[in-house]
A protein has these predicted regions:
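...with weaker cross-activation on analogous glycine-rich loops/strands in unrelated enzymes
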Residues: 108-173
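Bacterial N-terminal signal peptides that target proteins for export
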Residues: 1-11
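N-terminal capping segments
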Residues: 26-113
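Active-site signature of cysteine proteases
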Residues: 160-209
Length: 209
């Protein structure tokens, strides 16, 4: 009976260790999990925004290495997921962060971000795709969970009304080199005072003050 209890205790300890990000990070490596059929090598810089925020390759969309990234001692997310880039860009450019989420689509349900300087709460709101106002620089485009089962998040970097384009920065979308200081451009149309971004699965945008 005592030996059975000891074995059970050992098993529980092992399970607890395996459930921690540190254990995943120690066992997981790009060479083991994310080295085949990559759009670009894991960890390679894909591009850098005009403000100096770099985006890194995640190899391919279904690659997940449970290795946390930190910026000046503050957690920015799991390398190199879309949520990590969105959070890191906000930290650099708005002095804001947001809580941990299971998937990118879950950002849609967050109603406040946190100011890094003093920990105060900053209200944020959602605007559905097809609303009466375009997103602004710094807003987050949020995609439904139907996209790859996780959704996606991208940062609005520029709104070009003349060309009717929204230029975004992001990680883990196509994992390809950026054409310039942005990852890609999204067309939009205007109909009856409402604006539609022509991108599949897009819920809308999180308005960032």
């Amino acid at each position: 009976m005592k030996r059975r209890q000891t074995n059970l205790h050992t098993l529980l300890v092992a399970l607890l260790l395996l459930s921690t990000p540190q254990a995943y990070a120690a066992d997981a490596s790009p060479s083991a999990n994310c080295s085949t059929k990559c759009s670009s090598p894991y960890g390679e810089i894909l591009g850098t925004t005009a403000d100096g925020t770099s985006a890194y390759s995640n190899c391919k969309s279904d690659c997940v290495i449970f290795e946390p990234n930190q910026e000046q001692g503050v957690y920015s997310g799991i390398k190199w997921q879309c949520v990590e880039f969105a959070r890191r860009w906000l930290m650099h450019n708005r002095g804001l962060t947001f809580g941990d989420v299971d998937t990118a689509a879950d950002i849609w349900a967050i109603d406040s971000f946190t100011r890094l300087s003093d920990g105060s709460k900053v209200p944020v709101t959602n605007q559905l795709n097809g609303s009466n106002a375009l997103p602004h620089t710094g807003d987050l485009l949020i995609y439904a969970k139907e996209y790859l089962g996780t959704g996606h998040a991208a940062v609005v970097l520029e709104v070009d009304r003349n060309k009717r384009l929204i230029r975004v920065g992001e990680e883990n979308y196509q994992n390809k080199k950026w054409p310039a200081n942005y990852a890609r451009s999204i067309e939009f149309i205007a109909r009856n005072g409402r604006y539609w971004l022509l991108d599949a699965y897009l819920l809308g945008w999180k308005k960032i003050p």
